[in-house]
Amino acid sequence: LTRADHTHHMPTNVQFKGSAQRLQKRRISEETCQHYKVYRDGELLRFPYYSSDKTLQGFKTKTKLKDFKYEGNTTDTLFGQSLIPSTGKRIMVYEGELDALSGWEAYPNWAHVSLPHGAASAKKDIQKQLQLFQGYEEIVLFFDKDEAGKMATEAVAALLPSGKVKIAHLPDPYKDASDALQNNDAEAIRKAIWNASPYQPDGIVDGKSLLELVTNPSPPCDFEYPFAGLQQMTHGIRYGELTVISAGTGLSLI
């Protein structure tokens, strides 16, 4: 991961509160929290969001009861986007902030970002950042394994540059990266990234999967045509085949 500019500007109406602390239950270290500037402020966890020019705009706050609120202004950027360069080898995209932190904890020094509004707004949020993804060679979508996560994966993958998208798959029973790390299985996160499968849209077939079909000779014909030219072109007819003969196109000669 190329070193990024971590200089952040702050308007006067929002400010950091609290301090970086280890998230014991989540198995996320103080160092990871400090890297993302995710601070504990009493009962709140505060996730900073920045504008595209790295000006601090506001915070998403989370309570122990998993209630979320926003302070300051909302932005179009992804969580963690201010920490990453505009180009790179690989970028991981998660549904939630704690998943992104879990990804960094398991696989540090790579680009880990998350959606600002979860799976429901995934397509809209990614659409606003298409220019960012153009700069990366590989885009790993690491969304939750529930139905909402699967739908978001399909919607987002279809938006992103063809040939760059891979889908991360966690083994059961883990539902997301945070769940795996809470169970002390950082290796599952790493393997999900390393073994992410290339995205293949419905109806599109990988040419490599057809190699055997096109390189094997056709089976012998069951019957030969009585027409020499047609026989030479088709090598006869086989059961299950249909040969359609149509007229040429153009102006009628009649």
Q: Predicted regions: what is each one?
A:
Residues 1-57, 74-89, 131-134, 194-209:
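TOPRIM metal-binding catalytic domain and adjacent DNA-binding surface shared by DnaG-type primases
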Residues 43-135:
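Phosphate-handling DNA/RNA-contact segment within nucleic-acid enzymes
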Residues 91-93, 133-148, 169:
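Acidic beta-strand-to-loop metal/phosphate-binding motif
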Residues 119-123, 143-154:
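Acidic, metal-coordinating catalytic cores used for nucleic-acid/nucleotide bond scission
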Residues 129, 141-144, 152, 171, ...:
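Long, basic/Gly/Ser/Thr-rich N-terminal segments
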Residues 129, 151-162:
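Short, aromatic/basic amphipathic alpha-helical patches
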Residues 168-205:
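Interdomain "pre-motor" coupling segment immediately N-terminal to P-loop NTPase/helicase cores
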Residues 202-254:
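The Walker A/P-loop phosphate-binding site
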